[in-house]
Amino acid sequence: MTAPNRPPARPVGGPPAARMMMGAGGPPEKLQDFKGSTKRLLKMLAPQRALVGLVLLFGVASVFLSVLGPRLLGHATDVIFDGVVGRMLPAGVTKAEAVEGLRRQGNGKVADLLAGMNDVIPGQGIDFDKLLRVLAWVVVVYLFAWVFGVFQGRITARVVQTAVFDLRNQVEAKLSRLPLSYFDKQARGEVLSRATNDTDNIAQTLQQTFAQLITALLTVVGVLGMMFWISPLLALIALVTIPVSFFLTTFIGKRAQPQFVAQWKTTGRLNGHIEEMFTGHSLVKVFGRQHEAEQTFREHNDQLFASSFRAQFISGMIQPAMMFISNVNYVLVAVVGALRVTSGSLSLGEVQAFIQYSRQFSQPLTQVASMANLVQSGVASAERVFALLDAPEQTPDPAPLEMPPVQGRIAFENVSFRYTPDQPLIENLSLAVEPGQTVAIVGPTGAGKTTLVNLLMRFYDVTGGRITLDGVDIATMPREQLREQIGMVLQDTWLFGGTIAENLAYGADDHDEAAIVRAAEAAHVDGFVRMLPEGYETTLDEEGSNVSAGQKQLITIARAFLAEPSILILDEATSSVDTRTEVLIQRAMNTLRTGRTSFVIAHRLSTIRDADLILVMENGSIVEQGTHEELIAAEGAYARLYSAQFAQAVAEVD
């Protein structure tokens, strides 16, 4: 059974230059709920709490060891400095005697510096054994920090990819539950962009920010603790950077958010245009519209360039600003630290460690700030995907019904339907079709012919009245159970990339090679298939370009026959085939329609004159019904339609 294929809506906008000035087709839209979308994005990780806990555990271990490293290096610096100073002092005196001697010589500041050095021994040089032990511990600490970081990265990749894997499954399941009305209102490229590009962007955002944010926050806490341990005064100086960094990040981030939203919306529109032009490239060339298609592409591309440039430029200002703040902090710490060393309040190694910590303290803040563009981009994509997941679904299916074999009696009882509340399309339509009847539905464009079939298939649900199958309201039947009884052939043929046999068997669960061949013979597919080098194993490309339009139509008809439905729906099934092929199809149809209720929406004389009942629709209502001869004799709407559309065809046949 094939599904309806509707053209996507096409975006409309003003001149490209004007749109570029505005960002992306107008003022950029802000994220509707940044906090809510962020929380929902993080909740995707909830099913993997244990692994998230391991990420946190390895992060704590890695950060703890990384924070311990500068302290050990500071101790190594003290060992070296103590040895250098000790060698300059006379041997045979104590440190206290050396300090007192310096004070007597008027070198009070040097004496204060020496007094603050704990392990200096006058006359003794660098203790290399002690230095090597300290450096060995440094190597061990950084080695294990790296190992824990590797484990954290591996588990993070598992957590993120599993979450995105589940998200893709949710999107796929959601698409199957959405009503046809959703796809009527959305460009196919836009839906594809949400299901692919936006999902991939979410994966990239989580992969590049999740563990890094955890590590950055832990690093800030750990480094801050070590800084206060070494010198509360210098720690307070370093703390000044936090509110300044937060203010700058927030200020810049708020201005980048709307641009990221515009970037991903424009990406969806661009994908929609590309998909539309690719699927219809033959018609674009036939009507000489390549220039217009290229112009539209350039307009969308200009919009995407403008919004992407603004988003990246604005968000990219964060990192230089953070580097400036970090450098100012570095200068302040170095100056104040040097003064503290000369006063003997701190050792040189402690100041050296503190300077390293100030860099370590600024680095995660800079990382968090620079990740703001990734986070905003990811949340913008998440909001688009969540909008898809939150779209109203079709009404839930009831439990399967126990039904006797379907006879095929269809009744429309006072059916009303409207696509939008203020635009009624069908009002109080009543119709009874007996089993085995062939009903032709004709009428001008927009009369409601296809809508009638969509209601029968439950692509849409009626807004008033009911439709019954063998006396059972189809609204009480699961859609799958209903559609199993219906074979449908559309005017727009749909074939997927696969063999001819696989395409024929698409609508049937249980089938064998003999059944496929019988259906192909009935639809006159077998003849041309056996002329192909690989026969039924011939691989069709996605567009089926290696078979003709008429052959594609025959394959879709054979597919419906293989499903052995009780009801046939032919939506202009022969409008794209030549006269000879149409005659072959009609001969097969006359046999295959036996015992099946058939609905035919067509403008070809051959599908109308032989129908048991012809319905003439105008403005959603049946204005006439009867056989071909009866309606011609009535000289009403059908006769006028016949004269306008079919008289020439009759003359050609006669």
What is the predicted function of each stretch?
Residues 34-38, 42, 53-54, 168, ...:
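Alpha-helical membrane-protein architecture signal
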